Amino acid sequence: MLSAVCNSQFMELFGDPVTNTQGREVRPFKDFMLDIRYGTSQPPTFNELGEFKFIRATNIKAGRITENDMLRISADEAAKIEKCRLNGNEIIIVRSGANTGDTCVVTDEYRDQYAGYDIIVTLNLEIANPVFFNELMNTHYMQAIIKPLTVRAAQPHINSEQVQNLPMLVVPLQEQEQFATFVRQSDKSKFELEKALSELTATYKRIIAENLG
């Protein structure tokens, strides 16, 4: 529901990012980047008591990071894949498999954690807000522009060059940041709603159990 609200708000403010209904300037994604790199090619040894989280493709859903089945690694394993350490505000793009092309922003709680095998994009924050670009890619732009790139090989796959050449709307940073604030507020509302529903369900189950007892 709330992701649909974000999509609708994006289209209202900035137009259709596929057909560019507002006639904005368009530049390749690389013009907004400071760095783009691949994650590790060798899986680390996992440890459920490890100090660090290891974000895989399966942890990236609907433009967000999910904790479901999150694996962990030790400090020793983390040291072997230092290039995968996250500073926060990167965008992770799944590079192969069923979820190829799915994206997320590395939010504050995942700073100093580790990305898995996927593409890690660091934007120039002086001109680009990662929340804005993540939401842009999670409009119907995902199905119209990104997903078709991933099916050109036998197995779904996207590479760094394809990501760098994605066409992106040019939007003033202030407008990007205002929209990003709206997205964060929507995410917070969604979290609070899910928490309230969870508490309500727990209360209902407790009442039923007490009555049956």
Question: Which residue stretches match the model-derived regions?
Answer:
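A structural connector/turn signal
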Residues: D76, K80-I81, D108, A153
